[in-house]
Amino acid sequence: MRRRFGVKMASMDWLLDLYQRHFDWRDLTLVMLSPVFGIFIAMEAWRFRKTGVFDLWDSFDSMNSGGSYLVTDLILLVVLVLPAMGWVYDHRLFTVEVTPLRFVGLFLFVEFLYYGFHRGSHRIRWFWCAHVVHHGSEKMNFGTALRQSWFYPIAGNWLFYLPAVWLGFEPRWVLFALSLNLGYQFFVHTTWVDRMPAWFEFVFNTPSHHRVHHGRNPRQIDTNFGGTLIIWDRLFGSFVAERDAGKIRYGVTMRQPRSLNPLHLVFGECVSMWRDLWHHKDLRILWKHPDWVGERYPDRAMPEPLPDRAP
């Protein structure tokens, strides 16, 4: 028994060593913001307790996904993401010392890179396999913001931010800017706020803009990808105002999750993608739009039924 316990402890030494060498307070930005998120979720749930904005099982899905995401993301950060970013940083073009003004510039650059990541996550099926978890809820509330996938680091979402590291920004500052970006985005997942002042709506991502992004009707799909800013959508033609979007129904168009099984929520779309790949023998499925396989093989594409949500 002692020997077995010793072997198990020894097998964890490499992970503890990685944490000791890589750990930094910036890694815990979203963890430190979690109490704030919890307060706002509780306030919103109480405010809309009789309106159907919150659903018990849907909220359970979101909280479960969010908590497990934070844990797995921290592990994969030190095991995979930071070592890879560190290698790129060792081959950087310049060395950029971070000052307050330069950090503002970095934040704006990371926001631009986030737009690329977010747009790619909707239009490339490989990345959609991770991002679909966030869009699986048919509700729009603060809890939905926490609905994230363990699969993100494995799918390679961090690859989109390597240009900032290659230019000379230390990886942790890049990830810190991204964490602040994601922290802001928590507050746009709500129906509590109607519209912000016109100047704010023109520049920043807002609840109004993001409600459109989470819609599944034709006018709402693949729109409003910005994280903190909406200017990239205006520049690149992906912006749709809520007043022009029609009635919004939340969720996804195909394979809407109906299971409480966390493994199904996280990996269900991955299984579907690999099944399509095996069935059609077409590698383009990996990088084409998630709907492409149904358009390319309409006679053979059959959305698979999913189990009903637990009562």
At which residue positions do the language-model features occur?
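Cytosolic-facing loops and C-terminal tails of multi-pass membrane proteins
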Residues: 4, 245-311
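Alpha-helical membrane-anchoring segments
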Residues: 9-13, 34, 38, 69-83, ...
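Alpha-helical transmembrane segments in multi-pass membrane proteins
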Residues: 20-37, 57-73
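Short, strongly hydrophobic alpha-helical membrane anchors
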Residues: 2-27
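Membrane-interface helix termini and inter-helical loops of multi-pass transporters
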Residues: 15-18, 84-95
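Membrane-embedded catalytic scaffold of the fatty acid hydroxylase/desaturase
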Residues: 67-79, 92, 96-249
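Central hydrophobic cores of alpha-helical transmembrane segments in multi-pass inner-membrane proteins
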Residues: 35-46, 81-85, 107-113
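Membrane-interface helix-loop junction between the first two transmembrane segments
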Residues: 41-60
